[in-house]
């Protein structure tokens, strides 16, 4: 399966973020996938599972992203997005999230993107 996004960055290596990274890596023609995590120990575990693009370096993770998936708790989305913008998040990438609610994240981060 070919994706329209050559580089996908997942911010957050918990259950949802890690599962997405594994699913994307398993595609026949996978995009470049970066999985950003805070904890260096998580890097080891993710690499052992076959996620090669796992990193604690936010700049490395977002630099060439065409799609960014926020896979962190809702309360962490705004500060993480600010940090990602400061780290070089491309202006034209698509940003989405895996949160269970949408209004609060939209209210919290829309001013950062306009």
Regions from the PLM with identified roles:
Residues 80-114:
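Rossmann-like NAD(P)(H) cofactor-binding subdomain of soluble oxidoreductases
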Residues 71-73, 99:
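Glycine-rich, N-terminal phosphate-binding loop of Rossmann-like dinucleotide-binding domains
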Residues 68-69, 96:
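N-terminal Rossmann-like NAD(P) cofactor-binding module of classical short-chain dehydrogenase/reductase
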Residues 53-58, 93-96:
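Short hydrophobic/aromatic-enriched beta-strand-loop microsegments
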Residues 65:
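An anion/phosphate-binding loop that grips the pyrophosphate of nucleotide cofactors and donors
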């Amino acid at each position: 399966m070919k994706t329209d996004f050559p580089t996908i960055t997942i911010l957050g290596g918990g259950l949802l973020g890690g599962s997405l990274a594994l699913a994307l890596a398993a595609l026949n023609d996978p995009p470049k996938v970066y999985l950003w995590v805070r904890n260096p120990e998580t890097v080891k575990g993710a690499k052992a599972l076959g996620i090669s693009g796992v990193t604690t370096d936010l700049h490395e993770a977002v630099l060439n992203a065409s799609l960014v998936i926020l896979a962190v708790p809702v309360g962490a989305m705004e500060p993480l997005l600010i940090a990602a913008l400061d780290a070089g998040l491309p202006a034209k990438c698509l940003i989405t999230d895996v949160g269970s609610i949408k209004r609060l994240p939209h209210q919290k981060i829309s001013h950062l993107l306009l």
